[in-house]
Amino acid sequence: MIILGFESSCDETGVAAVCTERGLLAHALHTQIAMHQEYGGVVPELASRDHIRRVVPLTRQVLAEAGLTLADVGAVAYTAGPGLAGALLVGASVAQALAWSRALPAIGIHHLEGHLLSPLLAEPRPEFPFVALLVSGGHTQLMLVDGVGRYELLGETLDDAAGEAFDKSAKLMGLGYPGGPALARLAEQGDASRYDLPRPMLHSGDLDFSFSGLKTAVLTRVKAATRDGGELGEQDRADLAAATQAAIVEVLAAKAIRALKQTGLRRLVVAGGVGANALLRAHLARALKPLRAEAYFPPLSLCTDNGAMIAFAAAERVKAGLADLREGDHAFTVRPRWDLADIQAG
């Protein structure tokens, strides 16, 4: 079965075609970074309008690249939440309209499930069960993944997500949008040892996270440097960026390793936008060697929000018998706030 998937939860419009037997056939993505840069963050109304402009051309592109027509599509999938309500409605509306016009089933997918399963798109493919570290601008969670639809929350952030800590710290340093990648680039030129920043909850013994204290520490350093009309010098900024990144990465890696030890597993999947961070990848590769454990990452192109992970998650649900393939009445809802535990397979 060929599934056409749509992602529109925030500021990326993604469309992809996935075959349940052959895997990913084609995917296309448009990011709105340039549009939101002048505002320093995502403007929900602008995001929704841009999704409307992009989704049909991207759909045509994917079908052409895969050598498909709509007659070849057996089901459609879309991100049903969590995310921005207006943005979610664009992808859901297009998917449901297409499903209605072709008498196809429409499968609503949890955005985080898409991220959790995205490393399975790459080779080598991790076998179940595994521990998943989900790190993005909006979420930081450790999950035990026993199979498709079988997820147990092991720990999560109690305040800011890791990606949010990157972005907010970058903003305090006067870096551009999006802040996380800008901070990571600048950190390459810095000396992390110049600033002693806290590692919140590093030794808490549990698997939860907290990054608000780190953000406050960065603010304190910036205020100290800019007191009495001073400014944060370029090298100081690079050093502070390096120290901030090192603190976040150390906490993420330590908690992930603790999760592996507590579960007795030796497979760690890292997903979400922060999973593209080069220091995190290198740090985990070193830290996992003594455990004889393996880390699995999605391709860099699939770390950000994308349609491939949505279509693929739908395909995995179909193969696991967890998707309702009956043609429905195509009434639908989106869920801007949606707990991953609500989609358990039982």
UniProtKB/Swiss-Prot annotation:
Biological-process GO terms, alphabetical: tRNA threonylcarbamoyladenosine modification
Cofactor: Fe(2+)
Cofactor note: Binds 1 Fe(2+) ion per subunit.
Residues in coiled coil: none
GO MF annotation terms: iron ion binding; N(6)-L-threonylcarbamoyladenine synthase activity
Entry keyword annotation includes Glycoprotein: no
Chain sites annotated for binding substrate: L134, V135, S136, G137, G138, D167, G180, N277
Enzyme Commission (EC) number: 2.3.1.234
Enzyme class: transferase
Function: Required for the formation of a threonylcarbamoyl group on adenosine at position 37 (t(6)A37) in tRNAs that read codons beginning with adenine. Is involved in the transfer of the threonylcarbamoyl moiety of threonylcarbamoyl-AMP (TC-AMP) to the N6 group of A37, together with TsaE and TsaB. TsaD likely plays a direct catalytic role in this reaction.
Protein's UniProt name: tRNA N6-adenosine threonylcarbamoyltransferase
Annotated organism of origin: Bordetella pertussis (strain Tohama I / ATCC BAA-589 / NCTC 13251)
Top-level taxonomy: Bacteria, Pseudomonadati, Pseudomonadota, Betaproteobacteria, Burkholderiales
Gene: tsaD
